[in-house]
């Protein structure tokens, strides 16, 4: 399958290019979208990709787009994909409501998956969090996430995704149960998220389930950002023969 990388100059974008250099599990890098000059030397790649700032040409040259860019960039990408539908794997966070609506429109034409975190470990953490939230009905739930000091959004998209998982399991009102700034007494039907920023931490997420006399913590730590690139490529492979629809990352576990 031919892969197009959108957001190739970013941290994860560069890792995607590195993973695709020798052809990841039969995937071929066919196109790279860049706004300015691309620093990557493609002479060592098994196939020389199209490197372009022409969005329509970029989309035409691939069968699947993997996106790790910025919210505005995703909006532009979706406009092009609505004209020329291709499989989409998107890991960009902080998307506006209008952009998410365009994603739903594309899902009528092509398979797509949008996730805040592409690591297999986070996929499993989500499933464990759902089970713990469901079974430990009297436990207070708190989420702590830690990232590098250059991360722009807080709380992280992954932390919000974990919150949604826990709130859904409990039957909480997802719009009102979230607390990111705590003052005074804790309300029973609330889930808190604390965001820490410092150093070069790739990502750590911990969910605590606090009971009387004991507590359980479920934690995931990313020690290498390559897991996000590999995870996105695995998602692309999984979507290859799927019908047009917006898929959830937990569906990969069957």
From Swiss-Prot:
Its EC number is 1.17.1.8. One of its GO terms (molecular function) is NAD binding. (S)-2,3,4,5-tetrahydrodipicolinate binds at residues 148, 157-158. The active site is at 147 (proton donor/acceptor), 151 (proton donor). NAD(+) binds at residues 7-12, 91-93, 115-118. It is found in: Cytoplasm. It catalyses: (S)-2,3,4,5-tetrahydrodipicolinate + NAD(+) + H2O = (2S,4S)-4-hydroxy-2,3,4,5-tetrahydrodipicolinate + NADH + H(+); (S)-2,3,4,5-tetrahydrodipicolinate + NADP(+) + H2O = (2S,4S)-4-hydroxy-2,3,4,5-tetrahydrodipicolinate + NADPH + H(+). InterPro entries: DapB_C (IPR022663), DapB_N (IPR000846), DapB_N_CS (IPR022664), DHDPR_bac (IPR023940), NAD(P)-bd_dom_sf (IPR036291). Keywords: Amino-acid biosynthesis, Cytoplasm, Diaminopimelate biosynthesis, Lysine biosynthesis, NAD, NADP, Oxidoreductase. This is 4-hydroxy-tetrahydrodipicolinate reductase. Catalyzes the conversion of 4-hydroxy-tetrahydrodipicolinate (HTPA) to tetrahydrodipicolinate. Belongs to the DapB family. One of its GO terms (cellular component) is cytosol. The gene is dapB. Pathway: Amino-acid biosynthesis; L-lysine biosynthesis via DAP pathway; (S)-tetrahydrodipicolinate from L-aspartate: step 4/4. It holds the Pfam family DapB_N. NADP(+) binds at residue 35. GO terms for biological process: diaminopimelate biosynthetic process; lysine biosynthetic process via diaminopimelate. Its main location: cytoplasm.
């Amino acid at each position: 399958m031919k892969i197009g990388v959108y957001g190739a100059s970013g941290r994860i974008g560069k890792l995607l290019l590195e993973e695709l250099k020798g052809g990841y599990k039969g995937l071929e890098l066919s196109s790279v979208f860049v706004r300015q000059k691309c620093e990557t030397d493609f002479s060592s790649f098994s196939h020389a990709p199209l490197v372009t700032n022409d969005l329509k040409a970029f989309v035409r040259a691939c069968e699947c787009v993997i996106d790790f860019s910025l919210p505005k960039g995703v909006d532009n990408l979706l406009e092009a994909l609505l004209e020329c539908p291709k499989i989409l794997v998107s890991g960009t966070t902080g998307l506006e409501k209008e952009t998410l609506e365009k994603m739903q429109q594309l899902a009528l034409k092509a398979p797509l998956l949008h996730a805040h975190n592409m690591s297999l470990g986070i996929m499993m953490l989500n499933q464990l969090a759902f089970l713990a939230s469901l079974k430990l009905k009297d436990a207070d739930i708190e989420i702590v996430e830690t990232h590098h000091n250059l991360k722009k959004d807080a709380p992280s998209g992954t932390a919000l995704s974990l919150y949604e998982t826990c709130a859904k399991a409990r039957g909480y009102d997802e719009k009102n149960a979230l607390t990111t700034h705590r003052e005074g007494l804790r309300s029973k039907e609330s889930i808190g998220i604390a965001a820490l920023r410092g150093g070069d931490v790739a990502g750590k997420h911990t969910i605590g389930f606090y009971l009387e006399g004991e507590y359980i913590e479920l934690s995931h730590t990313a020690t290498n950002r390559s897991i996000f690139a590999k995870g996105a490529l695995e998602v692309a492979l999984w979507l290859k023969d799927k019908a047009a629809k917006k898929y959830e990352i937990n569906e990969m576990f069957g």
